[in-house]
Amino acid sequence: GDFTRGGFTHGMTRGSRHGDEGLKIGRETMQPLWDFMNEAQHDQKPFFVWYAPLLPHDPHTPPERLLAKYRDLAPSLHVARYWAMIEWFDETCGALLQFLDDRNLADNTLVVYAADNGWIQDPGSPRYAPRSKQSQYDGGLRTPIMVRWPARAQPTDSPHLASSIDLAPTVLHAAGVSVPPTLQGINLLDAKAVASRRAIYGAVFTHDSQDITRPAASVRWRWIMEGHRKLIIPNPAREPAAVPELYDMTLDDEETRNLAADRPEEVKALTRRLDDWWTP
């Protein structure tokens, strides 16, 4: 819908969830971002930017200068296009960070990178491959979370578990705003809290909501990641033929060897923790 429905004062998208005018951001121009931040600086006001281009989302239409770099390296033209789209997106992110640096805004600006789902490009079509987007596997669930704040966050690569539900408490803490006790997630800038986390949880829903007033009606799978173990529990109402799946993500990060039948006690223990988190 219209960007104003989300509480934004400025924006491009007015109808389609896949862009309409918003499709131009990143692909054709970054000027609306520059204009917005320049206006905020002129008015001496803090600003919030949600930069969410359809990059590397389809349509995969990268410029030839980027596609040429991958045409002979990728296993297919579809994959080459996707790789080029990723670099195109990287370029625009770099331009955004450079804008902040050039105006001495970086030290007072928290930048958070997140994605809504993973994507494994199907070599034989323009679509995503199985076991990626909309699946219960890491190809669809595992995405990068990056934080940039030169004045407060030193560059590092954390081996600990993080979740998208951590973004809200992280931003609230950074802004000095009290975090409601009912809000799930932890502050990712708190190294002690991150290191002490035991597990993360999640659910995979149908693409379209089955009942907007009852989220449980759309659940396909629930999952828990504890250390190197990942358990996936199907919703029998949605996936009647599916079985529980247990994987050792250190030894089998592509989730091809289901250990559930061999480790029933682990399945029971992890299922209890998953049920304690949420039982639809």
Predicted regions, residues:
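A long, amphipathic alpha-helix that forms part
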Residues: 30-38, 68-109, 174
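Active-site His/acidic residue clusters
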Residues: 33-82, 117-130, 265
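Loop/turn elements at helix/coil->beta-strand transitions in domains of secreted/extracellular proteins
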Residues: 42-49, 105-111, 196-197, 226-229
